[in-house]
């Protein structure tokens, strides 16, 4: 069986929809992670209103200037720390982790672990 890139994307989207439906049923605030080959994005979204409460990305000038390359584990760790600090400053301490269908491996795992180190619980 040969998988094309299109099939991988469709499978990832299908996995992400299943997890989002489960998280929405719980009514929990969720930490959504998205990654591309060059950048990492993390958002904390309220489940009821679907509004972004906290956002951090490697596209931000302060973060981008302090990193040599924005698509590696070092950048993911920095995003994890920043998103956790911003969430804790707004009074958000417990979230559900939404990995958007990506494997819990590599940059996604590093982002989650660095957010936990700062004090975000999920």
UniProtKB/Swiss-Prot annotation:
Keywords: Ribonucleoprotein, Ribosomal protein, RNA-binding, rRNA-binding
Keyword Ribonucleoprotein set for record: yes
GO biological processes: translation
Pfam families the UniProt entry points to: Ribosomal_L18p
CDD domains: Ribosomal_L18_L5e (cd00432)
GO MF annotation list: 5S rRNA binding; structural constituent of ribosome
Annotated GO CC locations: cytosolic large ribosomal subunit
Secretion signal span: none
Function: This is one of the proteins that bind and probably mediate the attachment of the 5S RNA into the large ribosomal subunit, where it forms part of the central protuberance.
Subunit and partners: Part of the 50S ribosomal subunit; part of the 5S rRNA/L5/L18/L25 subcomplex. Contacts the 5S and 23S rRNAs.
UniProt name for this protein: Large ribosomal subunit protein uL18
Protein source organism: Buchnera aphidicola subsp. Acyrthosiphon pisum (strain APS)
